[in-house]
Amino acid sequence: MLEDPLENVLNVVAHCLPMEQAVAVWDSALNKNLIDYPRLQRLPFNGVASQVLANVSRFADSGLESFVRLRLAWLKLRIVPQAWVLGHRVDYLIGDRLILLIDGSQHEGKQRRLDNAHDFELRQRGYEIIRVGYVEVMFDWPAVQLKIMQAIGLGMHLKKR
């Protein structure tokens, strides 16, 4: 059986896929503990692969989260991925109290009811929530970005005095 080492596959991915997709693949490898960041840092990546390495995070729980992280980097605000808030992980905490949640296909039925209960608890405690889904992130990003920018423009990310 012929098998290429993961490091070689990641290098090829970096050179063959657009940046967002390459970062999502690398993030997934880190998240699944198929490789660790110190090992990646020691490898002689160059060109676009070194750019991908500079953008990876082991905290991305899905490819959607990788895309969103890269798309929000320009904001220059404190953005905490996979933050713990009131005993639950949220996809992103922007500033002090704006929460961005990204729903995948698993957010239906019982999961949706649990999500709604947690959203209610977050709102009671003064957090603002933006919840978006796969289709919005992948096919209508400008509308998602506009929601986030409007919320920030209204100061919804800032701690209330």
Describe every region a protein language model picked out.
Residues 1-34:
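Hydrophobic alpha-helical segments and helix pairs
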